[in-house]
């Protein structure tokens, strides 16, 4: 950077002494040397040859290392020729009249009014350039004025975009004046104000264009009066060998001054000062400093670098250029350490494809982005100080030192905007942050050197030669929207689209609204307008919105209420179960007497299992995870089959219920109650539920597989039980019902079909389809809405008298007696249920309590000892009437030999509810004389059972009655989808809402092995090798409780 003080010589004295010596030296000038510069054939000879020769001699003298106090006369001779324009400063020019037009132009250019007036007086108002020279020479008195002149010299008005600019004077091509010869400028005095003295007259014209305003699209320009001749107005076509092609310059209104921060607020900013540092750069180290349109210098190259080997430093221009278009080239200037020939050598060989767009600086001129959006800077001549050789290279032509090389603009329709009329611009404080261009990929345009072109150094940026200004802190990205000027940073298609929208007069908000509904062409623009910090995903099209709305509308407020009530209840229940498991662990550890370290280890194991359980609960299950082996039984609206889980090869009993049948028969509440009791039951009397899940058509219960069969199958085989066997089973049944009552449930469907016998001969309860816990979710009315038929499963229906579904006669019978018993079972247990074991208060709906289950115990005891139910009838309707009139229909046959205790227990259980045993719980039955031989204080399940079923292998199903695979349930299953669709009626609009919170997974899942298989009596004869493997795997499996 040039030093702030003047003169830039080795003289060490104050300013007043220097002025005095200058004046004395001017009175006694020394003889000038006759050595001159090399003059070309077309050089300008208007300057005195003696002056040129003297200056050349002074340069040669300065190249030598002079001592601090060198020859004084040579220094004065140097100063004399640099101050020739001010030779009359001590004459009558002080009283000369100041040209008001020139004064105004200097003030507009940023000069101080007092200094401008003094300069015009001292120069006699000859020209503006003379006044600027005076101001620059007096800049040591006021550094601000020196800075103003330096900025004016380094910058120039922007290039115009008019296709045919008006030429106010003959161009260089048509005059006798030719471009002066190339000569080197060296020495310290050329860094100071005397640099303009070396400028030929033709190049000074480009520093001071007219101040008139004109529209860019007009063919003619209006030119107000100027303080200098119109013959020196800038508009010329540069021909010659120095240029790769012709460059056309046109006049632009005002001075394109890039003012420094010291006087920026004193003068009105112009349209050119709104340029900012380019956001991206070409790959070849081509980046951009803050001053647009300029090339700044690099200071790290040696002065002896040959021509063409110096880097060029690019500063972006205002508008973009496109490949193949005759648009504005980037204005180039050589570095201070390079030759001017570098520019012309590159200019003739390097194709400039494009110039990257420079971003607008937010500190400058925020309100004028639309007045002249395509005006670029016109670069002024750049001074150099590194030309130490007095002679140019012989291989180079004689170029001039002008670096304001521009190209003719062809107006591109993309860059055209509607400009109504030029208006004077004033400095206004910013009221809104400037629109920041969206981040784009760096420009891919680079300088591609043709063959024979020199330039080994990459193009990079040097910020040392220009006044840098730090940008302000950025605004939040979500507050910055793209402006009209941002259209230059996108591709050509997006440019055309955005300009067409702006010409139609649409606002940014309108375009933002239309972009969400428009075509794919403005997808890029729509993405840039989205708020970047929003965490909510933005839906791209209206079709997704419609799908989302349809999904939301499909769930009614009733469904939301239904779901939330059950969900909150289950969340609370889950927490209570977690606390209960922790308390249970603490109690067990206290009983075992574990030390503190062992207890802590057990707690960690429980915590890990809790974490695994939470993760497994979220895993979705479906029926494809199981393989069906064999059907075990068929119920009213479902079936039970033996299934194997694929991953663990464990055997389960999987109960499947069709949703359509559950809804048609109003069994939603009963299914919910069955799921709840099976999930909550954690004792040895109830079949354990491991998983429950659902799909579109069915509900699935995955439970313990009890291989011993049910009590009904055993009754059919044995017909009549011995009294000791009946006593054992009724005692276990009493304990099982007691456990259900303690859980808060009523089974309501205790019958031999729902009593299973495990492999040890002990019983378990199953099929809680009619169970109720007196909960709001177990109430059938909670699931009913509209005009849906309200019918309980135990209410007589039309199918009760229809025994056409009984197919016992279709089977081949080996024994007539067995066939008759099977038909009797069909009569007792039809597909729609039987009232044989139901208490009369339940059938009469007079209100019932847990006593109804004890009625069923008396009926089962009667059937075990007698061989048939007490209210057997040909049809379910007749059976129901007999149950209701139990006082007249209940008779114990006289031919059956029963003990008095058994008769008494039957009559005390099958009686009115107010005098029935069990009012005080199961203790009433335990105290009955019939159980005198049973010790209820001991765990009865640990006692050996009178009857142990025969199980040959884990998948043995011989204890279950064979089931016809072509049963009505299977025939109807093919029409389940069709029947399911017909449920979408006004009375049952959303049937799937009834099965919320159905999914379940047990915490203690026994590692996938639900039961223990006993060793077969003869393994070699009863099991094949595959079955033996399964048997061995399940042999040692016991429930694992932490």
From Swiss-Prot:
Residues 932-1010 form the AGC-kinase C-terminal domain. The gene is Lats2. It comes from the Eukaryota. The keyword ATP-binding applies. Residues 23-44, 237-282, 378-399, 442-481, 501-550, 1014-1042 are annotated as: Disordered. The modification Phosphothreonine is found at residues 267, 999. Interacts with and is phosphorylated by AURKA. Binds to AR. Interacts with AJUBA during mitosis and this complex regulates organization of the spindle apparatus through recruitment of gamma-tubulin to the centrosome. Interacts (via PPxY motif) with YAP1 (via WW domains). Interacts with MOB1A and MOB1B. Interacts with LIMD1, WTIP and AJUBA. Interacts with SNAI1. Interacts with WWC1, WWC2 and WWC3 (via their WW domains). Interacts (via UBA domain) with ubiquitinated AMOTL2; the interaction promotes LATS2 phosphorylation of YAP1. One of its GO terms (molecular function) is metal ion binding. This is Serine/threonine-protein kinase LATS2. Residues 30-44, 258-267 have a biased composition (Polar residues). The active site is at 749 (proton acceptor). Its main location: cytoplasm. Residues 97-138 form the UBA domain. PANTHER family: SERINE/THREONINE-PROTEIN KINASE, SERINE_THREONINE-PROTEIN KINASE LATS2. It is found in: Cytoplasm, Cytoskeleton, Microtubule organizing center, Centrosome; Cytoplasm; Cytoplasm, Cytoskeleton, Spindle pole; Nucleus. It catalyses: L-seryl-[protein] + ATP = O-phospho-L-seryl-[protein] + ADP + H(+); L-threonyl-[protein] + ATP = O-phospho-L-threonyl-[protein] + ADP + H(+). Residues 507-530, 541-550 have a biased composition (Basic and acidic residues).
């Amino acid at each position: 950077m040039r030093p702030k003080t003047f003169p830039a010589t080795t003289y060490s004295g104050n300013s007043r002494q220097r002025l005095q010596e200058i004046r004395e030296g001017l009175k006694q000038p020394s003889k000038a040397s006759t050595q001159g510069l090399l003059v070309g054939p077309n050089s300008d000879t208007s300057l005195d040859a003696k002056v040129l020769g003297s200056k050349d001699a002074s340069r040669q003298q300065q190249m030598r290392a002079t001592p601090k106090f060198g020859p004084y006369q040579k220094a004065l001779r140097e100063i004399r020729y640099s101050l020739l324009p001010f030779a009359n400063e001590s004459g009558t020019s002080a009283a000369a009249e100041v040209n008001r037009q020139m004064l105004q132009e200097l003030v507009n250019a940023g000069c101080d009014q007092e200094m401008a007036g003094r300069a015009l007086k001292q120069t006699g108002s000859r020209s503006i350039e003379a006044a600027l020279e005076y101001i620059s020479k007096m800049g040591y008195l006021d550094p601000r004025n020196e800075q103003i002149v330096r900025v004016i010299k380094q910058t120039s008005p922007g290039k115009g975009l008019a296709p045919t600019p008006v030429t106010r004077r003959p161009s260089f091509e048509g005059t006798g004046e030719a471009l002066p010869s190339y000569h080197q400028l060296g020495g310290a005095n050329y860094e100071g104000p005397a640099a303009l003295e070396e400028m030929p007259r033709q190049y000074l014209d480009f520093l001071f264009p007219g101040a008139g305003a004109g529209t860019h699209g007009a063919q003619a320009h209006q030119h107000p009066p100027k303080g200098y001749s119109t013959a020196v107005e800038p508009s010329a076509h540069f021909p010659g060998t120095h240029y790769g092609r012709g460059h056309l310059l046109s006049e632009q209104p005002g001075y394109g001054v890039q003012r420094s921060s010291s006087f920026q607020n004193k003068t009105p900013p112009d349209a050119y000062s709104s340029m900012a540092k380019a956001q991206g750069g070409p790959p070849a180290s081509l980046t951009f400093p803050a001053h647009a349109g300029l090339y700044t210098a690099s200071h790290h190259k040696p002065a002896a670098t040959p021509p063409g080997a110096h880097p060029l430093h690019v500063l972006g221009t205002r508008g973009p250029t496109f490949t193949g278009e005759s648009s504005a080239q980037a204005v180039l200037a050589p570095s201070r350490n390079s030759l001017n020939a570098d520019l012309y050598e590159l200019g003739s060989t390097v194709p400039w494809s494009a110039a990257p767009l420079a971003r607008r600086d937010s500190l400058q001129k925020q309100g004028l982005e639309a007045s002249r959006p395509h005006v670029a800077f016109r670069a002024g001549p750049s001074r150099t100080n590194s030309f130490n050789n007095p002679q140019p290279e012989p291989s180079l032509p004689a170029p001039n030192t002008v670096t304001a090389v521009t190209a003719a603009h062809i107006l591109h329709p993309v860059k055209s905007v509607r400009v109504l009329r030029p208006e004077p611009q004033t400095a206004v404080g910013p009221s809104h942050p400037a629109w920041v261009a969206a981040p784009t990929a760096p420009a891919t345009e680079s300088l591609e050197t043709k063959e024979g072109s020199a330039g080994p150094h990459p193009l990079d940026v040097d910020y040392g030669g220009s006044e840098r200004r730090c940008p302000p802190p950025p605004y939040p990205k979500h507050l910055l929207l793209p402006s009209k000027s941002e259209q230059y940073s996108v591709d050509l298609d997006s440019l055309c689209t955005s300009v067409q929208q702006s010409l139609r007069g649409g606002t940014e908000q309108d375009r933002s609204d239309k972009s969400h509904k428009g075509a794919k062409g403005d997808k890029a623009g729509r993405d840039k307008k989205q708020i970047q910090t929003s965490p909510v995903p933005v839906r791209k099209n209206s079709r997704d919105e419609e799908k989302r709305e349809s999904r939301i509308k499909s769930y009614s407020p009733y469904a939301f209420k239904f779901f939330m009530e059950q969900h909150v209840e289950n969340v609370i229940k889950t927490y209570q179960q977690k606390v209960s498991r922790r308390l249970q662990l603490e109690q067990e550890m206290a009983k075992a007497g574990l030390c503190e370290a062992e207890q802590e280890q057990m707690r960690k194991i429980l915590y890990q299992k809790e974490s695994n359980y939470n993760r497994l609960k979220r895993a979705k299950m479906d029926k494809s995870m199981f393989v069906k082996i064999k059907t075990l039984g068929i119920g009213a609206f479902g079936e039970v089959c033996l299934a194997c889980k694929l991953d663990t090869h464990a055997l389960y009993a999987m109960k499947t219920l069709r949703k359509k049948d559950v809804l048609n028969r109003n069994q939603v509440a009963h299914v919910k109650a069955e799921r709840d009791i099976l999930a909550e039951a954690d004792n040895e009397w109830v079949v354990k539920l491991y998983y429950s899940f659902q799909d579109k058509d069915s509900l699935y219960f995955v439970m313990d597989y009890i291989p011993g069969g049910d009590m009904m199958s055993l009754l059919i085989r044995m017909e009549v039980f011995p009294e000791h066997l009946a006593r054992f089973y009724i005692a276990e049944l009493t304990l099982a019902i007691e456990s259900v009552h303690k859980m808060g449930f009523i089974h309501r469907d205790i019958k031999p079909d729902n009593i299973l016998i495990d492999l040890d001969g002990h019983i378990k309860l199953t099929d809680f389809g009619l169970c109720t816990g007196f909960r709001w979710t177990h109430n059938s009315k909670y699931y009913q809405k509209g005009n849906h038929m309200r019918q309980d499963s135990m209410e007589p229906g039309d199918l009760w008298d229809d025994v056409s579904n009984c197919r016992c006669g279709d089977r081949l019978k080996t024994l007539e007696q067995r066939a008759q018993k099977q038909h009797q079972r069909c009569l007792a247990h039809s597909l729609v249920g039987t009232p044989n074991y139901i208490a009369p208060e339940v059938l009469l709906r007079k209100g019932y309590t847990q006593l109804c289950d004890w009625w069923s115990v008396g009926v089962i005891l009667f059937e075990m000892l007698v061989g048939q139910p007490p209210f057997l009838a040909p049809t379910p309707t007749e059976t129901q009437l007999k149950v209701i009139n139990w006082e007249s229909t209940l008779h114990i046959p006289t031919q059956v030999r029963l003990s008095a205790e058994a008769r008494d227990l039957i009559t005390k259980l099958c009686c009115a509810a107010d005098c029935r045993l069990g009012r005080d719980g199961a203790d009433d039955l335990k105290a009955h004389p019939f159980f005198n031989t049973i010790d209820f204080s001991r765990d009865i399940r640990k006692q050996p059972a009178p009857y142990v079923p025969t199980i040959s292998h884990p998948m043995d199903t011989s204890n279950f009655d064979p089931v016809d695979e072509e049963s009505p349930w299977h025939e109807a299953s093919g029409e389940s989808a069709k029947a399911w669709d017909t449920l979408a009626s006004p009375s049952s609009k959303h049937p799937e809402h009834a099965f919320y919170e159905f999914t379940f997974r047990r915490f203690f899942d026994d590692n996938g092995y639900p039961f223990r298989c006993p060793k077969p009596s003869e393994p070699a004869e009863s099991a094949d090798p595959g079955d033996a493997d399964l048997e061995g795997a399940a042999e040692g499996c016991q429930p694992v409780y932490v």
